[in-house]
């Protein structure tokens, strides 16, 4: 199984890259992961609602193009309105995917959200939190949760649960 993280934006602050890299390094023996950075749409200083929709559309097309390159993979989209999963539920979903031989593309949208087209094609809509999280922090939290879930699946002591 391979998980590709399709994320809008690049040039993350050093603390984000350091945190992400730590969990990315730790997870590799358990799960192959790859990061695909998608350029954010160029934004106006005071964008209108129409501009915001255009940014989501442009980024959405790039997300779907990156997803299409891989062939057969499930599309999981991080969305505030998505289903919340416990770490144990995530571990189960990843385990099921591994048994079925499914690859996963996990989408972190841009600052203005994800296009309706991407949401419509999503196999899973997942909310990390009811809180609004900054996109750079989502990268770190996502990778840590993937690592924690895989630790559960491999009986690694990292996750001690409740």
From Swiss-Prot:
Entry binding sites for S-adenosyl-L-methionine: 78, 109, 128-133
Domain of life of the source: Bacteria
Gene Ontology CC, one term: cytoplasm
Catalytic activity: pseudouridine(1915) in 23S rRNA + S-adenosyl-L-methionine = N(3)-methylpseudouridine(1915) in 23S rRNA + S-adenosyl-L-homocysteine + H(+)
Pfam families, per the entry: SPOUT_MTase
EC number: 2.1.1.177
SUPFAM superfamilies associated with the record: alpha/beta knot
An example molecular function term from Gene Ontology annotations: rRNA (pseudouridine-N3-)-methyltransferase activity
Main location (coarse class): cytoplasm
InterPro entries noted in UniProt: Alpha/beta_knot_MTases, RlmH-like, tRNA_m1G_MTases_N
Quaternary state and interactors: Homodimer.
Summary of the function given for this chain in its UniProt record: Specifically methylates the pseudouridine at position 1915 (m3Psi1915) in 23S rRNA.
The protein's name in its UniProt record: Ribosomal RNA large subunit methyltransferase H
Source organism (scientific name): Psychrobacter cryohalolentis (strain ATCC BAA-1226 / DSM 17306 / VKM B-2378 / K5)
Gene: rlmH
């Amino acid at each position: 199984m391979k998980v590709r993280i399709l994320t809008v934006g690049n040039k993350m602050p050093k603390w984000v890259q350091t945190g992400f890299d730590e969990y990315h390094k730790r997870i590799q023996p358990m799960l192959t992961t790859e990061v695909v950075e998608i350029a954010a749409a160029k934004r106006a200083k005071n964008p209108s609602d129409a501009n915001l929709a255009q940014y989501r559309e442009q980024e959405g097309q790039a997300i779907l193009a990156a997803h299409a390159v891989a062939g057969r993979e499930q599309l999981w989209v991080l969305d505030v309105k998505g289903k919340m999963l416990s770490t144990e539920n995530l571990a189960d979903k990843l385990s099921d995917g591994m048994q079925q031989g499914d690859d996963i593309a996990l989408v972190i949208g841009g600052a203005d959200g994800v296009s309706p087209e991407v949401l419509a094609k999503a196999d899973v809509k997942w909310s990390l939190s009811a809180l609004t999280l900054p996109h750079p922090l989502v990268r770190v939290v996502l990778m840590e949760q993937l690592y924690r879930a895989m630790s559960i699946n491999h009986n690694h002591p990292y996750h001690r649960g409740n």
